[in-house]
């Protein structure tokens, strides 16, 4: 199965990344696709929005999965993945993911830990969507290093548009140095419905 990995990123908060990720994922699932959502934000907003109000009480989250990869420890296929009634799977996140970002700073192959984890899942899903945190730290760089495409929700206003410069600079740097296959899939004023119509294939 050829897996499309899509990072949904913007270092500005409140632009609709989580809503885009959830609705696009459910829309793809309704179209018959096999979809995994990755919560890449230590705040766990995607995890909470999909019916898990206390992420810190979950037994296994993305920080655990990345920790296994980082320490070269065994990881059972699909371990920790939650199944949502609307047809999408979820790898949840909790506040421990912020500690993982600190651990990545001095790690070997630090930009590709998430990609190594997703490589264990690729054959199981047609689409993997990553909800990135509102920053350009190591977690977001990991998402960009793993993705085929990036969707950038942005409001059509001066300051949000101005903030795109730093994100696009990071995207171009990741593309040059780590992931030449990364493509920008969309920069548009947030409307999940139009985004869904233009992004489902």
Regions found by a protein language model. Name each.
Residues 1-201:
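P-loop NTP-binding core
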């Amino acid at each position: 199965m050829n897996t499309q990995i899509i990072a949904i990123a913007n270092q500005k908060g409140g632009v609709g990344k989580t809503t885009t990720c959830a609705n696009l994922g459910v829309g793809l699932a309704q179209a018959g696709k096999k979809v995994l959502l990755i919560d890449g934000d230590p705040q766990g907003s995607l995890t909470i929005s999909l019916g898990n109000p206390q992420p810190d009480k979950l037994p296994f989250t993305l920080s655990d999965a990345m920790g296994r990869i980082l320490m070269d420890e065994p990881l059972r296929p699909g371990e920790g993945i939650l199944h949502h009634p609307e047809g999408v799977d979820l790898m949840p996140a909790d506040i421990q993911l912020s500690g993982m970002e600190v651990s990545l700073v001095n790690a070997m192959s630090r930009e590709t830990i998430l990609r190594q984890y997703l490589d264990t899942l690729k054959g199981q899903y047609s689409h993997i969507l990553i909800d990135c945190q509102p920053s350009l730290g190591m977690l977001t760089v990991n998402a960009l290093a793993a993705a085929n495409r990036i969707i950038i929700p942005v409001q059509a206003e001066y300051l949000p548009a101005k903030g795109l410069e730093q994100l696009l600079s990071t995207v171009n740097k990741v593309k040059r140095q780590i992931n030449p296959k990364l493509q920008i899939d969309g920069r548009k004023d947030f409307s999940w419905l139009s985004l869904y119509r233009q992004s489902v294939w």
